[in-house]
Amino acid sequence: MVFKPKSTPLYLSGLFFFHNSKRFLRTISTHCSAKYDEENDRNHEIRNQQHHLYLYKSKGQHLLTNTRILDAIIRRSNIGPTDTVLEIGPGTGNLTVKLLEAAEKVVAVEIDARMVDVLHKRVADIGLQDRLHVICKDAMKAEFPQFDLVVANIPYGISSPLIGKLVYGGNPFRSATLLLQKEFARRLLAKPGDSEFNRLAVNVKLVADVEFVMDVSKREFLPCPKVDSSVVIIRPKNEIPDINLNEWCAFTRTCFSKKNKTLGATFKQKKKVMQLLKLTETTSLMRENALTGHNHECDEYYDGNNEEENTNGEDSFASSTSDLELNLFKEKIVGILKKGGFEDKRPSKLSNEELLHLLSLFNQAGIYFHDHVKPNNANVDFAAAYVS
């Protein structure tokens, strides 16, 4: 029986750290792409002590090796000499060393301690270690320090939640130049009416503008991935709509659960009507308590702190709600859709302005989509929403 290595070996020699390594790396990349299967890279032994390490495709470890493309990314990022740049997933530092030459400081977040060791050595060899700060941690769990720009070849597996963390994270920055999976980038760039248009684009474009820069062939990476990539630039907007972000995320989740169904069909479902009725009564009770100064607990089915109680509460709410009450509430929802001209429209063809208008119509009528009993955490909610 013949065993294949479960990851791609990358030999770290003096060649790797200099410009003349480009041809060497491309040769290895071509060889590896033909020899190794991405699906067999899960639990292979790491052998750092022999001056080589393994790159795990399952962890998104694909190193961009084309100097021309790296230089283009630096140019389009518009890095100033006083800027602090955040880089997610620096790997062995191909992009990092160029960022250090252009910026005052680079904060690199890398989860793989092996890569951190290589990165420190490489930066020390060119005498720029004073400009580099490395955080060896999962980027989704790390607390980012203040930064001006993001420039990164991010692991594809965390693209959605990471972008959510950046644009909704509360850290102001000028732009994020990101190398993403091509298909994902197309979804991010999609416009209403495009087949790729989705909730991802809607949520990002609420707070940021997205610009396409260029496509990058999969052959420019080591090891070679199965798909091509694209570079995009995300620029946060100076002004964003004054809305509750949790409410917006819950609303778009409802609308895009079946993006090609009409809104009338989506909102007429009995389960959805009951859910919105419950949330509406929760919000009304909370506002009544705020106005009267009462601070008593809501009924058990409004308590989001105990999962078991909350489940029992949903059953209690359903059993205590009459068909007449549900039908009246359903008619109210349909009336709002008809009033705004949305009943026969599909989410996949609506602009953000139209979606914001529809949400305002619902809220003005006292209908809400977010459970206001639960603690507000727009960042977590938004990041998690990308995955679905």
Predicted regions and their residues:
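C-terminal target-recognition/interaction regions appended to catalytic cores
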Residues: K4, A34-R47, N260, K270-Q275, ...
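Substrate-binding/catalytic lobe of Class I Rossmann-like enzymes that use SAM or dcSAM, i.e.
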Residues: V202-E325, E331-K332
